[in-house]
Amino acid sequence: MAVGKNKRTSKGKKGGKKKVTDVFTKKEWYDLKAPKMFLVRNFGKTLVTKTIGKKLATDGLKGRIYEVNLADLNNDEDQAHKKIKLCCDHIINKDCYTDFCGLSITRDKLCSLIRKGYTLIEGYTDVKTIDNYQLRMFCIAFTKKRPNQTKTTCYAQTSQIKKIRKKMVDIMNAEASKVLLKDLVKKFIPESIGKEVEKQCKKIYPLQNVLIRKVKILKRPKLDISKLMELHTDSKEDAGKNVKSLPESKEATNILSAELKH
């Protein structure tokens, strides 16, 4: 008697079950290093696929841009409205060394500044630093009520807006063209450029909330690793301070003199 197939038996699926592999076994972590102009030097970690054959892990890291809040970089909550962009330029061991790549203010900060009854004035210009970085800087300002003003609104005239915008452009060019990029970044943090604009435009029309809204890097010079490492190494002045010698106690001097006599 011929034995046929038993149709009641369950059929197996083609291929069977696939092995579940953990994706993170093929990845590795790298530390992110910020330049010395910021207080927090290790600002995070980044993930990248491990080196497989000719495909190096470092190639996947170079050129990555990280957006970090300035409050986290300087441990100051008053600077939480600014965002800094840092670009990974060089990797040593498991450390990624970054450089400044841009700046912007948060959307909620910008929305909180715009109000009815005030004129918004914005100016921008392309500048070049001493170390051949080409930047585009955007400055923003708002009109302010004059002292003892009874009028509820404070709108500036078109001629006044043009004069203020010209002043903005001139000050931004003057401040950026005479310094290195690292010194210019130090000016962005305390808003020294915005304060200078507010001071010089006071005669045209009183201003308030003058700040650098955005900074774009249009062109960067060829990477110089020695200059990049200078940004990440502390200078000799910061390395250590002289400590005053403490006066020797009377008990110690008495013991020493007694030992010398014997």
UniProtKB/Swiss-Prot annotation:
Signal peptide segment: none
Asked whether the UniProt record includes Ribonucleoprotein among its keywords, one would answer: yes
Matching entries from Pfam families are given as: Ribosomal_S3Ae
Name the source's superkingdom.
Eukaryota
From the Swiss-Prot or TrEMBL record, state where the protein is found: Cytoplasm
Q: Name one GO cellular component term.
A: cytosolic small ribosomal subunit
Q: Name one GO molecular function term.
A: structural constituent of ribosome
Keyword list (alphabetical) reads: Cytoplasm, Ribonucleoprotein, Ribosomal protein
Q: How does it assemble?
A: Component of the small ribosomal subunit. Mature ribosomes consist of a small (40S) and a large (60S) subunit. The 40S subunit contains about 33 different proteins and 1 molecule of RNA (18S). The 60S subunit contains about 49 different proteins and 3 molecules of RNA (25S, 5.8S and 5S).
- Family stated for the protein in its record: Belongs to the eukaryotic ribosomal protein eS1 family.
Q: What is this protein called?
A: Small ribosomal subunit protein eS1
Origin species:
Plasmodium knowlesi (strain H)
In the record, what lineage is assigned to the organism producing the protein?
Answer: Eukaryota, Sar, Alveolata, Apicomplexa, Aconoidasida
